[in-house]
């Protein structure tokens, strides 16, 4: 292959065999990336002239809702983008005004032994008088992530020193701005208990337990009961955001390193249950809804095909 590409040629016969740093993130490269982004969009359904959107629509007439509306997720084999543009950001650039947005995700607090759980200065999860609020996101098949509203960082079970300064193995901390690694330790499972509490387990199903230094999840032991209280209902907030709007854009999809890559096989092609619930409620309240699906793996969309007039799909990971 290298011979055919001209890598060993004395003369630069192949214009693509000597890429330099000057070619990285150049204006030409950015234009190519933008072109690829445009061409990757696939129209799956379009009835009653739902698309393209009416250019006369004002920003105040539009609502964007859904967990992928203002999120940007890197694919496992994708490059590190020099900048990131979310769907919401792109739409606001087009309209030159802010657009109503709701991610549809619950906000929750955790309590244990009569105390709240909060992120300490070093990022570790500790007992506190006032609990921190976390954004709860369900990715299907039992996989949750929890992001601190206050710090913007994800809870995770520390796996190595790369995740903090000499961390304790398995210590629960919020010290990463994205859930992205070979083993995504920001994944948690929630096991309801008979008394209404829950036991949290990490991605390997090791329960979260507590000792004098904080909370850990590194071995098969008895998990500590934790109360998880919803302090803001994400779906109801999204429903309120779409009432009376002329156009709703519902952004659903995946984080491609959660639930599907080399060491993980999905058991279903359905959207995560909470995304399906959001779709049901939004379609019921405002039928002028277009599904914008951001995904790097396939989904069955029977419910969306039945309830919504239009569906478009794009992969994740492009900077534009």
Report each predicted region and the residues it spans:
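Lectin-like carbohydrate-binding module/patch detector with strong preference for beta-trefoil
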Residues: 103-245, 250, 262
């Amino acid at each position: 292959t290298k011979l055919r590409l001209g890598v060993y040629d004395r003369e630069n016969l192949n214009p693509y065999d000597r890429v330099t740093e000057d070619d990285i993130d150049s204006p030409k490269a950015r234009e190519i990336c933008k072109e690829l982004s445009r061409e990757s969009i696939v129209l799956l359904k379009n009835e009653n002239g739902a698309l393209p959107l009416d250019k006369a629509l004002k920003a105040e007439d539009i609502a964007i809702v859904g967990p992928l509306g203002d999120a940007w997720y890197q694919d496992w084999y994708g490059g590190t983008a020099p900048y990131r543009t979310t769907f919401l950001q792109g739409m606001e650039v087009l309209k030159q005004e802010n657009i109503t947005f709701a991610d549809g995700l619950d906000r929750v607090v955790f309590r244990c032994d009569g105390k709240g759980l909060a992120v300490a200065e070093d990022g570790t999860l500790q007992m506190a008088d006032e609990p921190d609020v976390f954004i709860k996101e369900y990715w299907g098949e039992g996989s949750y992530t929890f992001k601190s509203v206050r710090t913007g960082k994800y809870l995770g079970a520390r796996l190595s020193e790369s995740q903090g300064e000499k961390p304790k193995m398995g210590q629960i901390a919020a010290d990463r701005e994205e859930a992205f690694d070979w083993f995504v330790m920001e994944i948690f499972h929630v096991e309801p208990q008979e008394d209404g509490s829950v036991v949290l387990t990490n991605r390997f199903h090791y329960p979260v337990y507590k000792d004098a230094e904080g909370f850990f999840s590194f071995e098969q032991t008895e998990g500590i009961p934790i109360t998880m209280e919803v302090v803001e209902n994400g779906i109801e907030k999204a429903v309120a955001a779409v009432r009376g709007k002329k156009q709703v854009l519902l952004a659903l999809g995946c984080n491609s390193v959660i639930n599907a890559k080399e060491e993980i096989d999905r058991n279903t092609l359905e959207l995560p249950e909470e995304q399906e619930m959001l779709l049901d409620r939004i379609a019921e309240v405002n039928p002028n809804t277009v599904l914008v699906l951001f995904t790097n793996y396939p989904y069955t969309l029977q419910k969306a095909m039945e309830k919504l007039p239009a569906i478009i799909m794009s992969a994740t990971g492009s900077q534009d």
